[in-house]
Amino acid sequence: MSIIPCTTWVKKGVASTNPAKIQLTPKELNQIIKHKQPELTPPVENDSDKKHNKVKKQKSEVGSSEIDEYNFDKYDDESGNIHCNIGNIASFEEDGTDPLITGEDDDSEKDDDIIKSNDNLVLIGRVEGGGSILEVFVYNQDEDSFYCHHDILLPSFPLCIEWLDFDPSDSKPGNLCAIGDMTSIIQVWDLDLMDSLEPAYKLGRKPNKKRSQSYIGHRDAVLDLAWNKHYTHVLASASADHTVQLWDLEIGAPANKFTSFEEEIQTIKWHPNEGHYLLTGCADTLVRLFDCRYETVVKSWDALGEVEKVLWNSFDTNYCLVSTSNGYVQYIDIRKDKSIWNVHAHTKEVIGLSLSSSCPGLLVTSANDGVIKVWDIINNKEPWFIWEKKTNLGALLCLAPNPDNPFVFAVGGDNKSHNYKIFDLLEIPEVRERFRERKLQSNINDTRTQEEKEEMMDVTEDKNSTIFNLNTTNTPSKRTKRNK
């Protein structure tokens, strides 16, 4: 088995130019290996795991013999397949040297360690056999380069990745990512550290009878994560346990829990401008909009199937998109009770739903049918189909837009030998012709009138309700050291 269940990008200029390397003595390394070995042993799957296992999305079998009409294979030739498991780490010699390293790093390898200001990082959750890895790739379009910078061993099958800059132990913005997996624990990793074997910190705790410890956080797999860019100490998590948790990263504990769901919550997204609104999509076929200040559902809409993804139209925040398990994409005006349009976009679950970072109307969808499609939704009344391709990546499990280039998207699938690509859509004549003259703009554009904003905020204010009632809508003024 070799699959890519999740991926995301890191903006240019965020990562440290020279990431620090963790230096461990042989004794320290052996102690960590012994401690981590049980965590990294694949658990026996029970009936509950099978029910919630998102790998069910990979049932499609897509042939890989298709001719690549646009020669997209060149974008991921360097990605390869990594077979890595902490149980197979080589033993170090007594002098601390690695027996697998026979010489000093050459200049080219040292240059590859340096992250340039025009480099993007690409975060890839990969599962190889019984092992799980977070791969940190460097992508530079100007230099036509895409290579693995470093990787991190993960304790469980990764289901979602979310980048964030909040480090509770540092007053400066960091470069971290939160990972949700088949366990109930969220791990937050420092991306500016190489060779790290432990996360920066964890969110959640499993019960321990010997220590008289009860659950903290979720009780089942974490299916999606959403970091709040306005209240940067807030992270939302959606779970197979039928709850959404809001975490206060300052103290590393849940501050609120929403339980209005009949099934697992598969997708969540914060409003681009109003940081207290959270959009959720559930397997019970309902899309819900929460006002997190009051822990209430402001509005809800019926979907045409189990909700796979929700997405705000950041170019016009009156609207959001929904994709479903039976292949539909729906477009919703949040001021209305029903969707504006529905299109049967794919034959299977639409797992990928992404808008361009700065080209209005450019929508990309991908699904378990192995097909990626491009649409134009600049006209809110109906979508225009522009282009499609049946890839050789297998069932498509994740899709992510480049935050700096409006036409670059990353896609991951479950084809054992070929499961990751970066697409430059300007290479496609139909897409280039449709969008090349369109004026680019920031994808955060609040077009609502003051009256419309007030209409969505008609709940009586309670200043003591949640973590959103702070003196500032950004980072708390003082951060305290905490146990990691």
Segments from the language model and where they lie:
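Short coil/turn segments within WD40 beta-propeller repeats
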Residues: G129-L134, T183-Q187, D220-L223, D241-Q245, ...
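Loop/turn segments within WD40 beta-propeller blades
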Residues: S117-N118, E162-G174, L225-T232, A238, ...
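Beta-strand-rich domains and repeat architectures in extracellular enzymes and scaffolds
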Residues: D95-E135, H150-A178
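Short loop/turn segments that connect beta-strands within beta-propeller blades
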Residues: N140, D192-M194, L249-G252, C292-E295, ...
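Eukaryotic helix-linker segments that join adjacent hydrophobic helices
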Residues: S169-L223, L235
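WD40/WD-repeat beta-propeller blade N-cap
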Residues: L153-P158, L203-V222, F258-I265, P272-N273, ...
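A structural motif specific to WD40 beta-propellers
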Residues: Y147-H149, L197-A200, A255-N256, T296-K299, ...
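Terminal intrinsically disordered, low-complexity extensions flanking WD-repeat/beta-propeller proteins
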Residues: M1-L121, G130, E349, I378-K484
